[in-house]
Design a protein with these regions (language model features):
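Short helix-capping/linker turns of helical repeat alpha-solenoids
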Residues: 43-46, 59-61, 66, 79-82, ...
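Terminal, low-structured helical/coil segments at or just beyond the last alpha-helical repeat
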Residues: 199-233
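Structural signature of tandem alpha-helical TPR/SEL1-like repeats
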Residues: 29-36, 64-73, 100-109, 135-147, ...
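Canonical positions in the second alpha-helix
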Residues: 40-41, 76-77, 112-113, 148-149, ...
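Alpha-helical segment of the N-proximal tetratricopeptide repeat
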Residues: 18-44, 59
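Hydrophobic face of amphipathic alpha-helices that form TPR/SEL1-like repeat modules
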Residues: 19-25, 52-59, 90-95, 99, ...
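Sec-dependent N-terminal signal peptides
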Residues: 4-13
Length: 233
């Protein structure tokens, strides 16, 4: 079973990437000044400022909380091809947060953000392909997107990419990622590595990982150890 999660919204990332003067005011909690500066840049077409302004409206910082204006500026930023805004808006449509749930719109926005190499969009788009949400189920596309996100350091993508490669019977690729997971302390990877190395007929390695899994209390690993007679290796 894949350990997918829906991660949160990232309007704050655009806020932090915008005008240095506006960011300085925000960090100093001078929200009124930050709002004024972001608003000026947003009206000039700065998509990062538009997304930041959406965040301020959404949270009532430096201005009265206004969900309608927050959505207006987020959509403007997304229409301006801002990857983080496309991701935020896509996730809102995917979850039905403050908007009517619309998986088709979510898929389109996450695809645009993913094409701009947004790791969070790639991860959640992979989930949509995996579940067939607003698209056909496509394990190969799931793997491609997960690997793209994993290479960028997306932790949950890294935890899942090995599993999807196992489903695709690409055991060499699976072992590469599962080894990384195991090195990072993911005990569930121990048993999966034992399975993978049995499939690859690398029984000496399978024995090592099966034993680690047994030591961590996995009864399935003990059965695997016995089934493949790993004590011989």
């Amino acid at each position: 079973m894949f350990k997918f999660i829906v991660v949160g919204f990232f309007m704050l990332l655009n806020l932090q990437a915008s005008s240095s003067d506006a960011l300085k005011a925000f960090k100093n909690k001078d929200y009124a000044k930050a709002f004024k500066l972001y608003e000026k840049s947003a009206k000039s077409g700065d998509t990062k400022a538009q997304s930041a302004l959406s965040y301020l409206y959404s949270n009532g910082l430096g201005t009265k909380k206004d969900s309608t204006k927050a959505m207006y500026w987020l959509k403007k930023a997304a229409e301006g091809s801002n990857p983080a805004a496309q991701y935020d808006l896509g996730m809102m449509y995917l979850s039905g947060y403050n908007v009517e749930k619309d998986s088709k719109k979510a898929f389109e926005l996450l695809t645009e953000s993913s094409n701009a190499n947004n790791a969070n969009a790639q991860f959640n788009l992979a989930l949509m392909y995996y579940n067939g949400d607003a698209t056909d189920i496509n394990a190969t596309k799931t793997a491609e997107l997960l690997e793209s996100a994993a290479i960028q350091g997306h932790k949950v993508a890294q935890e899942n990419i090995g599993r999807i490669y196992m489903q695709l019977i690409k055991f060499d690729e699976a072992s590469k990622w599962l080894e990384k997971n195991a090195a990072n302390g993911d005990e569930s990877a121990y048993y999966l590595l034992a399975e993978v190395y049995c499939e690859l007929e690398k029984f000496d390695k399978a024995k090592v990982w099966a034993q680690k899994s047994i030591d961590s209390g996995n009864e399935d690993a003990a059965a695997l150890y016995k089934k493949h007679k790993l004590d011989k290796y």
